[in-house]
Amino acid sequence: NLEGNITIDSLSFLTAPSSFFLKKFKVEATGHSLDRHLAITSDVLNGEVTGAYSFTTIVPSLMQTLKGYIPALINVTQKKQKVMENNFSLLLTIENTEAISNTLKLPFTMLTQGRITGHYNNLYNRFRFEAYLPKFNIGKSMFESGYLTCDNPEDRVNLKLKATNYNAKGLRNYMDLKADAKDNRIQTQISWTNNKERL
């Protein structure tokens, strides 16, 4: 839980045969334990996290929240740790990552600006995260209209994912996945259609 800023400019990544140049990357952290503000500014990732949070306890805190729905999948032997209040919101935008994905051989590439929003409150064990991914690749597969939500408004965790997979020939596969978790049970529904005409 630091306060201050880190600025990096003119950072180059070189791998054969590609390279990536990062003009700027700045992280600025201000505030105190109950009112923090983290701002990220760069060519690839921009955004902010605001509220009360502790970097050392965010993951254990989320695990504790998820344990209420699927305890069999959460490690019950986690070390007991004093968990601070984690009540924050976030907004992140991801720019085109083609250059850095190619250079670092990453399996995921953003082609147009995407956005991630969300909030989490461990005192009430409530969260909601959304991701808007207009156009992206996973490996050589191309996708558009990606939308992901994960939340727990009532007595279960809900996950929804929609995306369209397409190819250069115009074939489109429309995918819709819904899942929810409660009482150590995960229910999943997958829908898959395409625009191919029957012969």
Range-by-range predicted roles:
Residues N1-P60, K67-N75, L90-L199:
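Hydrophobic lipid-interacting interfaces of membrane-associated proteins
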Residues T77-K79, M84:
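Key residue(s) within conserved catalytic/signature motifs
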Residues N86-F88:
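Short structural boundary motif marking the start of a folded domain
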